[in-house]
Amino acid sequence: MEKWSLMTITVLLALTVRWTVSLGSYSGAGKPPMYGDYEAQRHWQEVTYNLPIRQWYFNTSDNNLLYWGLDYPPLTAYHSFLCAYVAKLINPDWIALHTSRGYESQSHKLFMRTTVFVADLLIYIPAVILYCCSLKETSTKKKVSSALCILLYPGLILIDHGHFQYNSVSLGFALWGVLCLSYDWDLLGSAAFCLALNYKQMELYHSLPFFCYLLGKCFKKGLKGKGLLLLIKLAGTVVASFAVCWLPFCTDVEQIMQVLRRLFPIDRGLFEDKVANIWCSLSVLIKIKNVVSPQTQLKLSFAVTFLSLLPTCIKLTVQPSLRGFKLTLVSCALSFFLFSFQVHEKSILLVSVPVCLIINEVPFMATWFLLVSTFSMLPLLLKDGLLLPYAVTTLAFLSACVASFAIFEKTSAKDLQLKPFSQSLRGYVSWFKLFPKIVRSLFLLSVTLMGVLSVMSAAVHPPQRFPDLFPVSVSSISCLHFLFFLVYFNVIILWDSKNSRNQKKVS
């Protein structure tokens, strides 16, 4: 009873923070002609409600794809239609074809913010609460603390309830998938992840860990017996899930091809804006977009991404465990973010939510990563006028993590899950005993640097010669952090002796 009372208070606090952030500005507010993501979501409601399904993804006189054309999978379109249906009942002007372009009002803002709030409340938040309650060998206090820190993660709050998007839907479905797999409900977990993938194609960041974990379970059960049966059931579940989601588009091959072209546009280039990945950071020294063709960029990014995630995926397939699965979700998503093609700054959320899932296991490193991930989106947040919510939610999150997990006391090799690695280095690296102090010092230096850059980005005008000095500095420093975290997570996965002991649980 006490657990659920504390969880209720946690949810109420999380909802209060979300609604408070939603009172602020949003992407593209009062900035014609393109406005921003807020207008994109409103425009998709306009298109899906007023046009037949066969025109949703095609360029027509009523659907100019150059003006926020629909470029997400069918479930996003259906969600937009559902929101539009409600909007029509309240005020038809909000989604009137053509004439509603750029519509802004306080009542419409309230409606749009409410749609995000409801989606969060129905899909993401219940998944977080049930996931934290499902944690084994964990006290009630730790379960509540984990839920509090996950729900107060500022990155997702600022993007969904500030900037304006519905990331909590796809991430929530993915989290439901993880939750189902933790109970060995493999078919339900597969279906939930298919929903996530059919809401946002960026969920491909998580697809390989799901695939490798389930394939590994099939191997362990034996492909001549129960394993083969499970594999057939999983394949059937995936096919059925996709068939249901894509059913209205399956009447015409050209419809399917056009949707796919909209989902995976090659001509947009290697990256957009000042994203904290390796390609954007390298472009400071080498203008990759100018010296390499788009097709070569695509092949290069694919090759580097594949090579970076291959070791952990092989380990997960050979030694499937729930712990290894969650860690591989982090490492694979981070590899995609750092090295893949057409990455947005908001894509770091696809790494952050899996990191949230292990905050009770490695609280120090998880907290550090989540702070950096929020900081990496600073240029976007400043553009949207979200400096105050950024500062307040980040400080609140850091305070919650320090109070809940005493993170500065969790820096030993054992606490950082590095004991197997440190034992393999014993006799070669004499300074490894100083590692806890080094990590704490690096954390404090990192937080100080992020704080100083945040203040300077908001208050100091850059030199005329370097107008992008602060955004580039933010993305480059964040990228260095992410490379460090990629190495760290790969090390604890590849040297994790617990995985082999946990295989019995998935056999």
UniProtKB/Swiss-Prot annotation:
The chain crosses the membrane at residues 4-24, 115-135, 144-164, 169-189, 227-247, 298-318, 339-359, 362-382, 388-408, 442-462, 474-494. It comes from the Eukaryota. Residues 25-114, 165-168, 248-297, 360-361, 409-441, 495-507 are lumenal. Pathway: Protein modification; protein glycosylation. Its EC number is 2.4.1.267. It is a multi-pass membrane protein. Belongs to the ALG6/ALG8 glucosyltransferase family. This is Dolichyl pyrophosphate Man9GlcNAc2 alpha-1,3-glucosyltransferase. It comes from Gallus gallus (Chicken). The lineage of its organism: Eukaryota, Metazoa, Chordata, Craniata, Vertebrata.
